[in-house]
Regions:
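Proline/serine/threonine-rich low-complexity linkers at boundaries of modular beta-sandwich domains
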Residues: 217-227, 315-327
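Intrinsically disordered, low-complexity Pro/Gly/Ser/Thr-rich segments with frequent PxxP/GP/PP motifs
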Residues: 271-274, 278-282, 373-403
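Short, solvent-exposed loop/linker segments at the N-terminal edge
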Residues: 234-239, 335-343
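Short, solvent-exposed loop/edge segments of extracellular or virion-exposed proteins
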Residues: 326-335
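Terminal connector regions
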Residues: 291-295, 300-315, 396-418
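Cysteine-dependent hydrolase recognition
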Residues: 1-307
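Short acidic/proline- and small/hydrophobic-mixed sequence motifs that coincide with surface turns
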Residues: 254-256, 356-362
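Asparagine-centered strand-capping/turn motif at beta-strand->loop junctions
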Residues: 351-355
């Protein structure tokens, strides 16, 4: 249970960017030791470093000569780097499990790849190097890596190791893959692409020997996480039937494609939406979900953006009037019950209220981001009281002659009282 708590803490801390100091997300330590397995190990390291630099990594540390590889790797891990890569030979140039334990990198946890003999032999060793990278530290004092790819057995071969290693980072950067598991698949795919005839069954063998210690769904940082500014209401009231959000970057520019999710502790409540080109998203609550009973957990996430977390507080004693699609009705021009292009629609929207307060002389205004022509966009409800409140007349609007089939038209009702 202690090891599991450590791993969970490391992954959550990594994904939530608990530590964003020292520009460590821009640092990568790449080793290619040619002393035993040959110059191709150095060339592999140079290739990986070049790919990282091409795709924006600012501080790529490359070591391919000069000895003292083990102490160099200890220093890099201890300082805190985003990527830690080794290509060399059995024994990892003297770098051991003890060296991982000696590091104090905290939540500056790299994605580690140690592609050589014996680093991923989890079935035959008490704790192989890839396991140590994942398990190192504690839940409150982490160290090591957030995930690590290693290679099982002492029978690996240089050319296949090189292909897997290059493919991992080509997948992450050139192919825009996002997770630890995807990067491993990319390494294996590159192996197959380079040796499609599967000579002596080596492709099959190496796709089994290379393995991941960690959660395959861990989203890896390939750039410094962007901080998102999220505008939203801090409370939700009885009767609220939608929540709106606006997401921007530190320069105030909209962030498109951010995933906004809403959750309660109860398992059946989960809603999500993606921000548009203006950074906006509206998440609708249907009737079954307006009966919210506790705070809502808001999470806004996007690749290479720091997640935004917030608890929207549920105000149990405060009720607001609301409209419902289920109780609204409309009349269309040809009375077929379907809104068609060019038709004029009469829309009747009752207002429901579950509280005890009385809202006097209430009016409602209809608006939309869709291409509709409003003929009568304001109606009078009088007093809004507990129960169902009907308007004195319907809203009237017409659809464009060019409206597409099955288009979703969002209508907004703004209530005001004197």
């Amino acid at each position: 249970s202690g090891e599991l708590a450590t791993v969970v803490s490391k992954i959550i801390g990594y994904e939530q960017v608990v530590d964003d100091t020292d520009n460590w997300h821009e640092k990568a330590a790449i080793v290619g030791d040619p002393s035993t397995s040959g110059i191709s190990c150095a060339i592999t390291a140079e290739n990986i470093g070049a790919v990282m630099e091409q795709y924006g990594v600012e501080d790529v540390r490359l070591k391919t000569s000069g000895g003292s590889y083990d102490s160099w790797m200890v220093d890099q891990l201890d300082e805190g780097v985003n990527f830690f890569n080794y290509r060399g030979y059995y024994g990892v140039s003297g770098f051991t499990n003890n060296d991982v334990d000696a590091a104090n990198n905290g939540f500056k946890l790299p994605f580690a790849t140690v592609i050589t003999c014996g680093t991923g032999s989890f079935g035959s060793e008490s704790q192989c190097l890839s396991e140590k990278f994942l398990r190192a530290g504690s839940s409150v004092s982490p160290k090591g890596a957030v995930a690590c790819i290693g290679t099982a057995t002492v029978g690996t071969h240089t050319m296949f190791n090189n292909a897997v290693n290059i493919g991992i980072y080509y997948g992450l950067f050139a192919q825009n893959l996002q997770t630890a598991g995807e990067s491993l698949v990319a390494g294996k795919a590159n192996l197959y692409q380079n040796y499609p005839s599967n000579p002596n069954n080596w492709v099959t063998i190496f796709t089994h020997w290379n393995n991941l210690m960690g959660d395959g769904a861990t989203m890896l940082w390939t750039d410094t996480p962007v901080v998102m500014n999220v505008q939203h209401q801090n409370n939700i009231f009885q009767g609220d039937n939608y929540l709106s959000f606006n997401v921007t970057n530190p320069n105030g520019l909209p962030i498109e494609g951010a995933l906004v999710t809403l959750m309660e502790d109860r398992s059946d409540f989960y809603l999500e939406g993606l921000t548009d080109s203006n950074g906006d998203v509206v998440i609708h609550l249907n009737d079954s979900e307006t009966n919210i009973s506790e705070n809502i957990e808001l999470t806004v996430s996007k690749f290479n953006h720091k997640p935004y977390l917030y608890d929207i507080e549920f105000q149990e004693e405060i009720y607001v009037p609301y409209a419902s699609v289920e109780t609204s009705s409309f009349n269309d021009s040809n009375n077929n019950g379907i809104m068609n292009p060019g038709e004029t629609i009469q829309l009747s929207v009752p207002i429901h209220y579950d509280g005890s307060e009385v809202f006097s002389t209430m009016t409602a205004t209809l608006s939309s981001d869709s291409e509709i022509n409003t003929v009568f966009d304001e109606v009078y409800y009088g007093n809004i009281e507990n129960g169902t409140n009907n308007p004195d007349q319907a809203f009237i609007f017409s659809l464009s002659d060019f409206e597409k089939h099955n288009t979703s038209i969002e209508l907004y009702l703004t209530l005001t009282n004197s």
